[in-house]
Amino acid sequence: KRIKQLEAEGYYVIKLVKTNKNGIPDLVAIPKDSEVLFSEVKTPKGKVSKLQEYRLKELKNHGCRTEIYRGG
């Protein structure tokens, strides 16, 4: 219910299922045109899946910064 409420208010909402930090809240609600950076981390030869490409595009369209970081 809260996700739908926030989306109706214009937020891009992400429900976190598993994180690297204990105690992180369940939802991330990002206002349009925010300065959030979403980084998809890959190995130098790692492939970005269609779903990952879709999500990155969705976030870009919402005004967020995105990147594909290739570590090595």
Residue locations for each model-derived region?
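Catalytic phosphate/metal-binding cores of nucleic-acid and nucleotide-processing enzymes, i.e., regions
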Residues: 1-72
